[in-house]
């Protein structure tokens, strides 16, 4: 059911338009269609700020920067980050996995580690 699918999304498996064909809204036929932006009843719940495509092809990896709506504060929370992997099958992209970067501090540690390995 649509309600069960929305609950599954909210449980941490991800907000993405790729699920919305169930609701008759979008298909993810191109990389540009992939997003973490999510609205409910006209209210933006997840506001995508930016995305960087890390790899393209049958398997696509995207880094998203976003904010989540905090109804108790009536504003968006701090910037958050997620890396998602998509597989293109049957003409559309489907999310296969994700890694949530839990804080700006964790993001800095990832950047520092990669920088030290690459340089």
Whereabouts are the PLM-identified features?
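Positively charged, low-complexity terminal tracts
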Residues: 18-108, 112-119
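Short, Lys/Arg-enriched N-terminal segments with co-localized hydrophobic residues
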Residues: 1-26
């Amino acid at each position: 059911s649509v309600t069960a699918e929305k609950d599954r999304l909210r449980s941490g498996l991800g907000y993405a338009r790729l699920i919305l064909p169930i609701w008759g809204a979008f298909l993810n036929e191109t990389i540009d269609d992939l997003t973490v932006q999510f609205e409910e009843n006209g209210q933006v719940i997840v506001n995508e700020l930016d995305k960087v495509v890390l790899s393209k092809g049958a398997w696509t990896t995207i880094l998203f920067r976003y904010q989540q709506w905090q109804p108790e504060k009536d504003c968006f929370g701090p910037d958050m980050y997620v890396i998602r992997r998509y597989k293109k099958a049957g003409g559309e992209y489907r999310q296969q996995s994700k890694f949530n970067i839990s804080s700006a501090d964790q993001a800095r540690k990832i950047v520092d580690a990669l920088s030290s390995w690459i340089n």
